[in-house]
């Protein structure tokens, strides 16, 4: 566990792989979308790389889809996700207590996710976690705000978070680390999600937490 020598006031948290384990819902939604194009995937674990990055990018990167085809795949993905995949999900053990503890330490909490904001709000409301957050920020359905860099900047701008030294991003994938760096803030990479230490360190993680308990201990 890395030790933190700063007192952050504002915590930005990723959703998938950081607050909730959303693997089943996301991979089943991707499986459904790929099936529309005649691609039969039976091993859901093989679709884990789709968790975290913008989905259109992943359809292009992993299956060679054109922009137009990736857009169509995204529509099919949302068709399944909006009715079923949204709730094929669970909160990481200890996360509820961690969020409560951070509020007790007079920190403010924000969500910064590549997931469409409308879905992020539904998920957090479903699990009764929305009350912990000052603001829940995500991507737009029309793709005008999709990169993690843009989402982090959006959350910071909307909430007037202009003291970069007081803000930290917490996430499990390289996009969280890169997005934080592009916005001039520190990042904590978590290993209980979908990325590994090499991915997070090489992407610029300021600190690494192996578990929710480590995260709690680091943010005293």
Model-identified regions with their sequence ranges:
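Helix-loop "lid/cap" segments that line or gate small-molecule binding pockets
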Residues: 33-34, 54-67, 123-126, 155-157
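Conserved H-loop
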Residues: 40, 130-134, 162, 206-209
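Substrate-recognition element of Asp-dependent hydrolases with the DxDx(T/V) motif
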Residues: 30, 98-124
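Active-site neighborhood of HAD-like aspartate-dependent phosphohydrolases
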Residues: 2-49, 63
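Acidic, Mg2+-coordinating phosphoryl-transfer loop and its flanking beta/alpha structural elements
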Residues: 169-209
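A short, structured active-site edge motif that brings together acidic residues
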Residues: 130-145
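Conserved Lys-Pro-Asp/Glu-containing loop-to-beta segment of HAD-superfamily phosphomonoesterases
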Residues: 10, 148-177
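Metal-dependent phosphoesterase signature
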Residues: 60-100, 105, 165
């Amino acid at each position: 566990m890395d030790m933190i020598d700063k007192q952050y006031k504002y915590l930005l948290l990723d959703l998938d792989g950081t607050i909730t384990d959303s693997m089943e819902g996301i991979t089943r939604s991707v499986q459904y979308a790929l099936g529309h194009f005649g691609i039969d995937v039976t091993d859901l674990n093989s679709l884990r790389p789709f968790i975290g990055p913008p989905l259109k990018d992943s359809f292009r990167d992993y299956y060679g889809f054109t922009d137009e085809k990736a857009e169509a795949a995204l529509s099919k993905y949302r068709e399944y996700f909006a009715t079923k995949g949204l709730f094929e999900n669970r909160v990481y053990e200890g996360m509820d207590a961690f969020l409560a503890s951070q509020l007790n330490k007079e920190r403010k909490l924000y969500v910064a996710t590549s997931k469409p904001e409308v879905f992020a709000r539904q998920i957090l409301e479903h699990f009764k976690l929305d009350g912990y957050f000052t603001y829940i920020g995500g991507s737009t359905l029309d793709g005008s705000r999709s990169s993690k860099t843009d989402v982090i900047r959006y959350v910071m701008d909307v909430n007037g978070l202009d003291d970069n030294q007081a803000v930290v991003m917490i996430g499990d994938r390289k996009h969280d680390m890169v997005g934080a760096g592009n916005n001039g803030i520190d990042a904590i990479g978590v290993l209980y999600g979908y990325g590994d230490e090499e991915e997070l360190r090489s992407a610029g993680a300021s600190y690494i937490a192996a578990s929710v308990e480590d995260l709690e201990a680091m943010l005293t």
